[in-house]
Amino acid sequence: MRSIVIIGCGYTGLRLGARWLAQGASVVGVAMRGASLDDISLAGITPVAWNLDAPPRDGNCAPVVDWDASIVYYCVPPPPAGSADPRLARCLAGVVGRPQRLVYLSTTGVYGDHGGGRVDEATTPAPRTPRAARRLAAETAINAWAQAQGVSWCVLRVAGIYGPERLPLERLRRGEPAIRPEEATPTNRIQVDDLVTACVAAGVSSRADRRIVNVCDGSDASSTEFLLRVARIAGLPAPPFVSRAAAQATLTASAWSFLGESRRVDNRRLTEELGVALAFHDLDVGIRASL
């Protein structure tokens, strides 16, 4: 029986845990909040509380699991400030033993802006936002820790995640504007169930050992095209259009950071080398499955 530990068992982690349970694995789900622990328990996953924002103390210790026998997934985002990831540092300090593999969920944001150009895993990261820089620092920390401990690792650079309860339906209902189609630039995304499939492959494939893997559907549709497709399929009004400059002037810095960069992310390592068959490479199919 495989042993799985999911640190940060939230939106993606719950689905990943369910997939592993269906394959007969034992699954531990780690979360920092009580409400999340309830969701983990309801999913049939063993819940464990671990506050990575606080130093170790009584009642806030690393999970008591057989780390040596486990595939460990780390899905916790870095804190919203700083240049490093103290949450990850506390986690790695609490791991006793040598997991079979450590899989870290990072972001394609580490590549920065390429003006719509194509990037793959050999592209030198050039993060433009503090959030992406913290992710890249975390990747470096994972690599250093794994090398020192002799642990297999895989970094998944994940594009924007959509799925059930993660479609912009309320935005469309509010009539919020989108960038004019002629000014909208390529973006990248992945349906959550395909992300789970990628996570499973990253945990077990020999071709994922000590590798970085991009996770996206390869569609490169702009944010505007995505909104238009969601509106059409969900039977909602299409959004009004504004210029790119007007959108930048009205959006928060955080929101604009997702639209101000453009790149086409190559996913051939995922689909050809790891052999992941994406169920939702067609956006329309993915959107319908997410409603």
Residue ranges and their predicted role:
Residues 168-190, 194:
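A conserved pocket-lining segment of Rossmann-fold NAD(P)-dependent short-chain dehydrogenase/reductase
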Residues 248-277:
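Conserved C-terminal active-site "lid" loop/helix of NAD(P)H-dependent oxidoreductases
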Residues 90-130:
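Conserved Rossmann-fold NAD(P)-dependent oxidoreductase catalytic core, especially the SDR/UDP-sugar
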